[in-house]
Amino acid sequence: MDGITVITGPRSGAGHLFALLRNFESIAPFDDLFQPGGQSAGVRIDVAELEAHRQGKSLLALKLTSAVPRDIAEEQIVGRMGMRTMFVVRRQIDAYVSLAKATALGAWRDTDMTPVKVKLDAERFAKWLDEQEAWYVHWKDWLERRAY
């Protein structure tokens, strides 16, 4: 089955994208398929494909974050036959502030963070920003190398 891997970072809006994808009859969105523990990524995708086929779906949509080790992501997810990729990137400062608010509240979904005020640490932001940029650069470079 063909698929799309959504490469994303924390608080990017990918959760909203997956909520929208649930409106398409032919798409089987799995935004939490790669939670820690259990089966390998490849086995999880195989099981998701079977489930999608039973539901009459023709396209898998998977969310890939830095929580998945890169070697596993390369071999079992992004490098899989028929898999395409797309990036979901939010303005980094907005993603970081949203992450800080969600962490402070312990609320990750369906919570209005507008009134929440947090103090930000510039050094922590710089470190987080470096990590996020390295994550996206890795996948951009990997995909460019693979295209030739």
Short names for language-model regions:
Residues 66, 71-146:
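PAPS-dependent sulfotransferase catalytic domain
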Residues 2, 56-58, 81-84, 146-148:
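Short coil/turn segments at beta-strand junctions that form active-site/ligand-binding loops
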Residues 1-58:
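PAPS-dependent sulfotransferase catalytic core
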Residues 39-40, 144-148:
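Proteins with a high burden of low-complexity, intrinsically disordered sequence enriched in S/T/G/P/A and R
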Residues 57-66:
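Conserved two-lobed SF2 helicase motor
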